[in-house]
């Protein structure tokens, strides 16, 4: 893990993720105001699916921006961009961290409503709405990055 993170981890279960994303969807009502969703790949694909279902939106685009290599944040690379200025669109990502990706998204889609499920202090001012505050130094373990594994008991016979 990068030197900027402490040992603190925030582990997100599928149930928590779904509950928080549905709360975000409620804040985006009425659904009729939206033309579509732009998911920031890859983390934004998961909340985009929930938002699309809850808001009955069928038009889902992607913007693919690479900024992490494993758990290290690096240079931004736009791999694919939805062709719109964002008017009438929700742009969604799972998390805003330092704000580097968010700044690029804002530049690309200035008229979009930009939302995330989780936000850290450095990035939070760059988006329009989010559900959960996360301390800047805390690493988030998203459910799509985890597997269920056996953990041996602390006490052995």
UniProtKB/Swiss-Prot annotation:
Alphabetically ordered keywords of this record: Cell inner membrane, Cell membrane, Glycosyltransferase, Magnesium, Membrane, Metal-binding, Purine salvage, Transferase
Reactions it catalyzes: GMP + diphosphate = guanine + 5-phospho-alpha-D-ribose 1-diphosphate; XMP + diphosphate = xanthine + 5-phospho-alpha-D-ribose 1-diphosphate; IMP + diphosphate = hypoxanthine + 5-phospho-alpha-D-ribose 1-diphosphate
Amino-acid positions noted as binding xanthine in the UniProt annotation, renumbered to this chain: 97, 140
Transmembrane segments: none
Residues that, per the record, bind Mg(2+): 94
Enzyme class: transferase
Principal location class: membrane
Membrane-topology annotation of the record: Peripheral membrane protein
UniProt keyword GTP-binding, yes or no: no
Positions that bind GMP: 97-101, 139-140
Membrane found in the keyword field: yes
GO biological process: GMP salvage; IMP salvage; purine ribonucleoside salvage; XMP salvage
Subcellular compartments: Cell inner membrane
Pfam families: Pribosyltran
A GO CC annotation given for this chain: plasma membrane
Positions contributing to 5-phospho-alpha-D-ribose 1-diphosphate binding: 42-43, 93-101
Cofactor: Mg(2+)
Pathway this chain belongs to: Purine metabolism; GMP biosynthesis via salvage pathway; GMP from guanine: step 1/1; Purine metabolism; XMP biosynthesis via salvage pathway; XMP from xanthine: step 1/1
Family designation: Belongs to the purine/pyrimidine phosphoribosyltransferase family. XGPT subfamily.
Complex formation: Homotetramer.
PANTHER family, sorted: XANTHINE PHOSPHORIBOSYLTRANSFERASE, XANTHINE-GUANINE PHOSPHORIBOSYLTRANSFERASE
Role according to the record: Purine salvage pathway enzyme that catalyzes the transfer of the ribosyl-5-phosphate group from 5-phospho-alpha-D-ribose 1-diphosphate (PRPP) to the N9 position of the 6-oxopurines guanine and xanthine to form the corresponding ribonucleotides GMP (guanosine 5'-monophosphate) and XMP (xanthosine 5'-monophosphate), with the release of PPi. To a lesser extent, also acts on hypoxanthine.
Protein name: Xanthine-guanine phosphoribosyltransferase
Biological source species: Haemophilus ducreyi (strain 35000HP / ATCC 700724)
